[in-house]
């Protein structure tokens, strides 16, 4: 109603005679959080820039951070939940994170573990930013959220530039801005 009053008082010359229909829609809020394994699109997984950890629980965020922050990373089968990965998560005290992690909890995680966390989404093969941190910490982790009808899943982006690189005639390495996803 205030909008209608402002419109009338703004000098438009129009007068509202009657309101024919008024509707109110209420939706249940479900914050974006991530749970168990979801396979990536072939267009994304073929770029070899992500590690999609095949977990059966809701700890994909913890496993992604563990892989990214591992001081002695494994050489093979990085997409599997191994004893080594579980031990890294215990050593770094990542097992204290409340799962599943929602976007509003990321600031607390960043301060607690001294790590910058950027989250990206995808629409088909196209990548876009969902949450870019303003804080600067000693480590930086980029995550991709993939979704299906039921749930979401975090995937560690190991090489952001390679993830966004498309096949072109130019063979030189391209560097991408995380905010606008443009290369230079």
Language model feature labels by segment:
Residues 1-184:
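Metal-dependent nucleotidyl/phosphoryl-transfer cores and adjacent nucleic-acid-binding surfaces
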């Amino acid at each position: 109603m205030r909008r209608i009053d402002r419109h009338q008082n703004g000098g438009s010359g129009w007068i509202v005679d009657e309101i024919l229909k008024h509707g109110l829609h209420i939706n249940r809020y479900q914050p974006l959080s991530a749970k168990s394994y979801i396979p990536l699109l072939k267009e994304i997984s073929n770029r070899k820039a992500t590690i999609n950890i095949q977990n059966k629980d809701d700890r994909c965020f913890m496993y992604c951070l563990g892989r990214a922050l591992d001081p002695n990373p494994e050489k093979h089968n990085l997409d599997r939940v191994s004893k080594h990965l579980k031990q890294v998560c215990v050593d770094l005290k990542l097992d204290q994170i409340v799962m599943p992690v929602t976007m509003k909890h990321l600031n607390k995680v960043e301060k607690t573990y001294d790590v910058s966390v950027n989250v990206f989404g995808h629409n088909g093969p196209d990548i876009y930013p969902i949450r870019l941190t303003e804080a600067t910490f000693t480590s930086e982790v980029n995550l991709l959220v993939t979704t299906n009808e039921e749930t979401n899943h975090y995937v560690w982006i190991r090489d952001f530039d390679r993830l966004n690189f498309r096949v072109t005639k130019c063979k030189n390495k391209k560097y991408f801005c995380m905010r606008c996803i443009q290369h230079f």
